[in-house]
Amino acid sequence: MRVNLLIAMIIFALIWPATALRAAVSKTTWADAPAREFVFVENNSDDNFFVTPGGALDPRLTGANRWTGLKYNGSGTIYQQSLGYIDNGYNTGLYTNWKFDMWLENSPVSSPLTGLRCINWYAGCNMTTSLILPQTTDASGFYGATVTSGGAKWMHGMLSDAFYQYLQQMPVGSSFTMTINACQTSVNYDANSGARCKDQASGNWYVRNVTHTKAANLRLINTHSLAEVFINSDGVPTLGEGNADCRTQTIGSRSGLSCKMVNYTLQTNGLSNTSIHIFPAIANSSLASAVGAYDMQFSLNGSSWKPVSNTAYYYTFNEMKSADSIYVFFSSNFFKQMVNLGISDINTKDLFNFRFQNTTSPESGWYEFSTSNTLIIKPRDFSISIISDEYTQTPSREGYVGSGESALDFGYIVTTSGKTAADEVLIKVTGPAQVIGGRSYCVFSSDDGKAKVPFPATLSFITRNGATKTYDAGCDDSWRDMTDALWLTTPWTDISGEVGQMDKTTVKFSIPMDNAISLRTVDDNGWFGEVSASGEIHVQATWRNIN
C-alpha cells in the first residue's frame, strides 16, 4: 500500500508542475439557442437585401447589406446605423484594445463574415461602413479585429454578401444551424501569421449553436413602369403618356391622383408578426411640412386609405400578407404645394420612398426601398418631356454586328405643354463618343475596356409635311432642331379659364449594326466578343414673347 501510494504521489508531483504552467483561454459552450424565425426582403428596385427578425431579436440575424437613404451621417434623426450582422444571442460586450475573432462551424456559406460590426456613429466605429476591419478573414470567419476605444462594441459579426445570397435562395420554411465561435483576448497576436484568439494564453471563448428559419420572403418587384403627370398652377393633375396604374380619384373631400406604386410578392410559413411596419415618407422636408397628412395617403387595395404622417400610420406584416401592391394617393393640394415650392420636373423616386421599421430591432430594423413604378411630374405650363415608347426608364437592346444585321432601334415620345406651341424644340444624344474621319461615332466597350468599337447613330422623325428627317447623331452631345416635327395637339383649359395646348410627337434613335466600321475597333484592330454602352437623350423647348 505504501509503495502504491508513493508511486501515486510521485506521479502527481510530476504532473502537477506541468499543469500549473499551462494557461489558455477560458472556453464556454452555451446550451443551444432557441430557433428563431426571420423575414428576408429581396429588393429588386434598389438591388439590395434586408433581413429582419420575424419574432424575438436574439440570437441576431438582422440588417441590410447596403446603406439606404436612411443612413445616419452624424446629424438629424437616427435611423439606419449599421449594416447587417449576427451574434450568438448573448450580446456580449468587448474590451477596449483587446482582439476579437469570430468564426462559424457548419457555416451555410464560405466567407460568411467581413469583420466586427459596430454602430456607425459610436466613437471608434467607422461612420461610412459600421465595420472594424480584422487582420484577416477566411472561409469560416474573421480574426484579429482590434476593439477600438470609445463607444460600446459587442460580439457581432458583419454579414457578407455571400451570406445574404444564401438567405435569398433558401425556400420559405427551411432552416439552417451553425456554430458561432466568438473569442476575445488581451494578447496582441498576429492573425496574419496564423495566430488565433483561441490559442492564446488568456481570454474568453464562447461557443453556441444557433438555428434560423426563413419564415417569409418579401420580394419587391421593379416593374420599370413609367408615366407622366402634368400639373397646373392649382395642382390639378393631368395624366400624360405612360403605363403606370394611375387614375384620378376623390377620397373624402380631396381630389387628386392615385397610382399603384409598389408591386410585391410575400411568401410565408404562416408567420404572424405585427412589429414590422411599412409606410411612405416624403423625402423633401419643405414639402413634408407644407402638406397635410391626408394630402398623401396609402393603401393596400386602392379603396381603404391611411394618411402619411411619419411613423403614426403604417401597414403591418400581417396586413401585407393579404395583398400584393401598395397604392399612393396624391391630392391636388400636394401637387399645388410642389408648385409653390418650385419643385418640378421631378421623379417620384426622388420625391418619396417607403420605409420599413421593425420595432423589435431598433439598431438595425430600419430600411428604405424605392417604388416599383415611376411618375415623372412636370408643370403643365411650359414644360417638355421625353420618355421611351415602351414606358420604361431604361430601355435596352442587344444584337449582332455584320452584314444584314438589324439596327438597334429605340422609340421615344416627346411632349411639350404650354400656353402655345413651343417656338423651338431641340434634341441631342450623349454617350461615349469618338470622332473618326471627321464623323462622330458612339463607342461601345468590352467589360475589360480593351475593345472599343465605333457605331454610327441617327435620330429621325416625321416632319409636318410627311417627310422623314434624319440626323447623324453619333453620341456627340450636339443639339438638333426638331421643331418642324409632326406634332399632335391637344388643347387644355386651366381651372382659372386660361387655355393652352399639349403637343406630342415621336422620334427614333437608331444604331446600325451592319456598318463596316463596326467590324474593327477605334484602333483599327479586329475584335470578338461582347461590347456595350449607355447614353442619354435630352430635349429642350423654348417659348418666346409669352405674356
UniProtKB/Swiss-Prot annotation:
Signal peptide limits: 1-20
Compartments it resides in: Fimbrium
Induction comment from the UniProt entry of this chain: Negatively regulated by H-NS. Positively regulated by IHF and EcpR.
GO cellular component terms attached to this protein's record: pilus
Effect of a null allele: Mutants do not express ECP and are defective in biofilm formation.
Keyword Signal part of the UniProt annotation: yes
Keyword Signal applies: yes
Domain of life: Bacteria
UniProt keyword list: Fimbrium, Signal
Role summary: Part of the ecpRABCDE operon, which encodes the E.coli common pilus (ECP). ECP is found in both commensal and pathogenic strains and plays a dual role in early-stage biofilm development and host cell recognition. Tip pilus adhesin, which is required for assembly of EcpA into fibers.
Quaternary organization: Forms polymers. Interacts with EcpA.
Family note: Belongs to the EcpD/MatE family.
Protein name (database record): Fimbria adhesin EcpD
Organism: Escherichia coli O18:K1:H7 (strain IHE3034 / ExPEC)
